[in-house]
Amino acid sequence: MLHIAKAELNDLDALMVLFDQYQRWLAIRPPLSQTRAFTEQRLHEQDTCILTASYRSSMVGFVHLTPLYSLARARRGLIINDLYVQPDSRGQGIARALISHALKEARARQAACLLLQAHQSNHAAHHLFESFGFIYDVSQYYFLDVTD
């Protein structure tokens, strides 16, 4: 049975296994110690929300929600900043369950909106998001890495 829960500090080791897989998939490789320290800080400060999916006592996926502040709307929103399901667990409704719980979390926090982005080639993700009512926004996003 699938279980969705908010991540806690005692989930850190299992999360690191998933984060390592996720970062490899994205071809982003910060040191795992840096990822661990950053994640531990997020969990301790509770400034973001990580929801985990576990199946048969094994963590198989997560969704990471971060706050977004809109002066135009004078409300807070949330961004699905990261969503990952282990490859051998895909196609079983786990991402759908994670998004469903992310929507519940957004409503519980009285968020004005829930935003996300997906790679252009990830058609399965596009279809999934649209099935929830997400609409494609043609806004142009730019990215600049400002780290040294």
Task: Give the residues covered by each predicted segment.
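N-terminal beta-strand motif that seeds the catalytic metal site of vicinal oxygen chelate
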Residues: 118, 147-148
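Residue-level recognition of the GNAT/N-acetyltransferase active site
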Residues: 68, 81, 86, 90, ...
